[in-house]
């Protein structure tokens, strides 16, 4: 490791001390860690890069069950977009996640389902899971679903969603999960793009104490989905007013009871697709990312085991939805492939109160907790009193996913939730990567709050100069984050549109995988994610990372969340506009005071915060105080909407019903127009 240079490009690394894993982490391990030293990680990483055939070949045989052994570990390249792994092998993902564990440990919990209302919760053992998966697979098989067919799943985060995914995989078919929050139009687009033959859904959903009419949305979508032949409807609430279309729709309970006994899984080739997952937030036609069976499954198992330091005795609580990649990889395929119980949570962090997540951790003695920073910000806003009610001493690893975690949230997570006794694992990856790209391996890699740390096995991260397209060498540098070689769990294509796949990920920098994110590598070789490269503001020739400015703003003790966008300016090209949500008690104080002077004072402090932390060139020209920022159902801030508002295009926002808080948009428009004197 080198010492810090006098002038740092990566200023985030200033005054950040490395934090070693606390001794309590090791005391809570059920057995010795899978990796016991930083040197061992470095040796394994070097082997994974220099000899990937041997490295991944050994792990492929260790972690997966094969119906037919593979003949070759890898082929193809990023340049040609023809990556393939474990050629000649055959396996079944469902068998790997269910059968082998049901035979070995039939009474071990597989799915720990925590419903929106606790009274509806249930635990499924591996034996019970196998039985229910075989029943649903039997229904699908009787409908003619076979290897290579696509099946859409539109369900809330419950046990049946997991069962449905596994049942589809059991037949060698391809599941396409659609987040149960998308509109009927979004369902239609995804079903049609994937040419789905069947849909699995439910009558209604429960979330945050509210009932959601899931079946009604599906019915609206299916008016224009000619490929759908059959629909299986799980009775989540049992509302008798929910109706079925004769000849198309069938009740889950009635159909599954027709099938009993063991239904053998269908072996598929390593490169056969396991699932499609449509990326969210983009305009135009949906983009169905294709993941293979063997490579994806190995990536899920390998990262779950090593990044989190997961053991058979552990319990993984991933507070994510199967409608997104986090739920696929770390609520289903990662833990279940290893025979580790997974907590499936249907509800929200705030219902019935802000202690719900911690109550679940205590109840099931979860050892690993994995959540998005958005949820952590919400929970910090509510105060620590709810955390103190529960015994969280079972926790060993605290994970973060979905967006960069700011140092202040990292510290809060570490101190208030983990009591300074856990390893915080900030993970960087994507829908397209399938599994973790960059993460500090639990119990091994020292942490720097705000940094995702170092690359995982087989991931050759690098930084590219966006102007020259040349790889940037050395440390204390910044550029576009890319990967130099294929890895097992990488997405293989965009469904029915390989040209789009090439143009989006592989052609921008030939020979590299383009992540779309900017990043920096500090003097120790740690990576700092700076957000999407299109989330850049160009002010007077200065290319400013919005994530960087947001991180500076968040350090102001009044701010709960911040989002920065660029706004056109005749003089400087663009100016920085910051939308900030205040902590609850400050919102109340401002409303009670109704004093513009107090708000103005706060805004000046925020601008000064950025001037001091980054420099005058990065200071926002305008700060808009709002009650809430627009977010997707997965918790990501929709900066696209804020950019439209700042551009004076509030009448061109498109469909905002898929937001978790669409009501926030009108308030933001009002605050923006008020500040800029618009009627």
Swiss-Prot record:
Chain spans, region Disordered: 1-32
Keyword terms of this UniProt record: ATP-binding, Ligase, Nucleotide-binding
Superkingdom of source: Eukaryota
EC number per UniProt: 6.2.1.1
Pfam families: ACAS_N (PF16177), AMP-binding (PF00501), AMP-binding_C (PF13193)
Record's compositionally biased regions (Basic and acidic residues): 14-30
Family: Belongs to the ATP-dependent AMP-binding enzyme family.
Protein name: Acetyl-coenzyme A synthetase 2
Annotated organism of origin: Debaryomyces hansenii (strain ATCC 36239 / CBS 767 / BCRC 21394 / JCM 1990 / NBRC 0083 / IGC 2968)
